[in-house]
């Protein structure tokens, strides 16, 4: 016979597995549709028209039209494509299900059109809303927070292809009760995360790891080098943190979302022309291209880091529906490669991983997620002790500093009140 604690944990096991699978399938379908549309917009259509896909005209035109299209969705769809991600944390309160179709369409358009945001925030919003709405009907005795946690865990597992990230994140958020052991509280979320990760793995494997030279033995000087790299990344990230609310307020002086996002898309197009196509889109595939291209110099990496960070701020400030983690990882990789090119004595594994740790820490203010992303992109067990040590001064630097999020306006724009 099972102990009552075990029976309690098993109660949510089946819903947890179902939510994890559903979270992954939603992500897979959205990404597949976005990929097909991206191929149409950036390969087939310019080829048919006899235009180079990397021509300045095409980049500016597609991103401007993407902004206008997303603006139309936000203006006229029911629920206005959900809340503004710039004003929301990664895991937020459930939104009305009526807002989800518009949010999904806005996300697909942004991903396919080359906007420098990832899918994580909208997908999280969709999965939480569906889990809460359906779960409340099927099992009304389970509170909304439980459904939110399961959907969040399933989505994190699906996004990163492993339940490890969910375990790290929820180990700090669920450890609030001394009466219930932590692993009792983690059981159902980890079931959801594992189901999400395994389902994603059946269709595709997220490629986070980069072909960077293996790091051998840790030296004391490497700790100092890593701390300096993380501090540089944090400084760059804090510039973006300072710019985001100010640019957000400036862009939202334009009350019409179609015009506002059209202007935002035009600016993104100009930034894309400056840095080239590798600076577009969410950044995961593009950082693989960046590492594979041996022709990039220190100045090229610097330009890519600055432009991608600027594009991230512009996209978020303009109201595009997307997340900030994936493009931030791209910025970290570009910064790390730049610093390695500038000081070759410092291994690329250190510069890249510590730059990712610093910039993701600025964006998420989550130490576990920052460590996970750094270790996922540069998978080397020798680096783990170094990253844990470097995290300490990085966390001190950010203590009490503002986060990369805009305070919600006291009065929403007219198109958000409809």
UniProtKB/Swiss-Prot annotation:
It holds the Pfam family Voltage_CLC. Gene3D superfamilies: Clc chloride channel. GO terms for cellular component: plasma membrane. Keywords: Cell membrane, Ion channel, Ion transport, Membrane, Transmembrane, Transmembrane helix, Transport. The chain crosses the membrane at residues 10-30, 54-74, 99-119, 120-140, 149-169, 186-206, 223-243, 258-278, 300-320, 322-342, 343-363, 386-406. Coiled coil: none annotated. CDD domains: Voltage_gated_ClC. It is a multi-pass membrane protein. InterPro entries: Chloride_channel_YfeO, Cl-channel_core, ClC, ClC-type_chloride_channel. It is found in: Cell membrane. The keyword Cell membrane applies. HAMAP family: CLC_YfeO. This is Putative ion-transport protein YfeO. It comes from Escherichia fergusonii (strain ATCC 35469 / DSM 13698 / CCUG 18766 / IAM 14443 / JCM 21226 / LMG 7866 / NBRC 102419 / NCTC 12128 / CDC 0568-73). The gene is yfeO.
